[in-house]
């Protein structure tokens, strides 16, 4: 890994292909220094993509991109990953320079009904968002092409339908995003050999934690080591969890670079040379 100004560059390629900006990384709730989960992905010949859209993400997005220009990819529908989207509905409908076309929205099977209910001004009704979004549902392991990027969703271990995402550009540069998950074989497969693994680490390690919910720093490091990733970026750390302890746990299991992301950081993902 080498450091660039103003971005951190990951890998040893000669051309920057994919950039990911942290719009929010606080786990489970909005934190004092960060919105909940949200990541802006930019690549050549590809419209800007926002992965997850938790509380506060719309405000952070305005510092980095035009909200009317983005398409949205949701890992799952827990509130801290999607409930700033009704604000984007308003932006796309009522901004004086609102876009004429629809944005793409990918997510779990009940995305349309769940977000429509959240956006509706009336209880028991669904806001029909088909005027502003073209909604698609993930299918496990079925690739989706958006611009120059190939995105492969994988079902992971979480109480609700939840997907990790593997994103690859034409050069072979690869990023895996865990979403929310417990430790599972699918997560290791998702991250196998990627250049960058953006992985949740919601708590420090303890046998008392329930299974199939979240990862500890220890488990994030174990998955990174088993998958043979090049660099581990930790995210989704709640305000009540020690970042330093989570980082130390991950480093004890994974001997590659480990970093806990913060809001507004941008990382460049490059294929191993």
Curated annotation (Swiss-Prot):
Was identified as a high-confidence drug target. One of its GO terms (molecular function) is 3'-tRNA processing endoribonuclease activity. This is Uncharacterized protein Rv1339. Belongs to the AtsA family. InterPro entries: cyc_nuc_deg_phdiest, Metallo-B-lactamas, RibonucZ/Hydroxyglut_hydro. One of its GO terms (cellular component) is plasma membrane. PANTHER family: METALLO-HYDROLASE YHFI-RELATED, ZINC PHOSPHODIESTERASE ELAC PROTEIN 1.
